[in-house]
């Protein structure tokens, strides 16, 4: 039983570490916007597990694991004008890759990724956009952001 618990704790686990929607100021040059506004939706995703999302080097070499994906669910009257609705974000390393020797070497943040969309929708009334992040080995998470 102890071995099974250890394996479960080492498994990859995706988390949405931040999700924001910020209005984008655009120059309309006097054109009518019909009450719509442009929003920048950003989602930060991290693998908080010990193992990478691909789990093993062998699976990575054989390209056996589908990538992490992020997808938006939009309210009526909203549309994505920058980016695709479903975005493939690749694989994320886990905490096993972190250096613990105190060296000055910086590997960046291979355990994190940022997805960004531009969404056009009416600002009033407030509308909700649901972000779904999923990976076949690291799970699925959802979060809602409000525009307007």
What are these regions (language model features)?
Residues 1-30, 34-148:
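C-terminal accessory segments enriched in acidic
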């Amino acid at each position: 039983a102890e071995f099974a618990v250890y394996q479960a704790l080492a498994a990859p686990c995706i988390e949405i570490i931040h999700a924001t929607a910020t209005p984008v100021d655009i120059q309309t040059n006097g054109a009518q916007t019909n009450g719509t506004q442009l929003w920048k939706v950003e989602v930060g995703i991290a693998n908080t597990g010990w193992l990478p999302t691909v789990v093993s080097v062998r699976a990575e070499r054989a390209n056996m694991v589908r990538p992490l994906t992020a997808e938006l669910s939009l309210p009526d009257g909203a549309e994505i004008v920058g980016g695709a609705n479903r975005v493939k974000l690749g694989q994320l390393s886990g905490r096993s890759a972190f250096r613990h020797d105190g060296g000055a070497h910086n590997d960046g943040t291979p355990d994190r990724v940022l997805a960004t969309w531009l969404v056009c929708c009416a600002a009033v009334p407030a509308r909700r956009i649901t972000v779904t992040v999923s990976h076949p080995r690291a799970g699925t998470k959802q979060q809602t952001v409000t525009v307007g």
